[in-house]
Amino acid sequence: VTLPTYDEVIGRGSVSELNYNEYILSLIKPEELNVLTVHAEVEGISCATMFGRFLKKARSKEIALVPLGTFLQENTPVEKSSIERGKIHGRDGWVSIQV
């Protein structure tokens, strides 16, 4: 995941529901893989209208949105990695972090 989730940035600094979409779009780096986690309970329910506007704005900027699975070919080996508990600024509690 390379982009912050809604709950990680909303209400922090100057990010509000009015400028959330623009904020996330400003973080996208065209030359890199950008990964945004979408939560069904947020973008799919309580913020569905806002998420719909995000999708339209992304398309108007010619930003391609695809599921991560499209980058995997059949039988692609997945490397093993270790994880540990860690903290991420703006996130309550601990999260699993790849080490």
List each language-model region with its residue ranges.
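C-terminal domain-boundary segment and adjacent tail
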Residues: I28-E31, V35-V99
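Alpha-helical scaffold elements lining the catalytic groove of polysaccharide deacetylases
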Residues: V1-P30
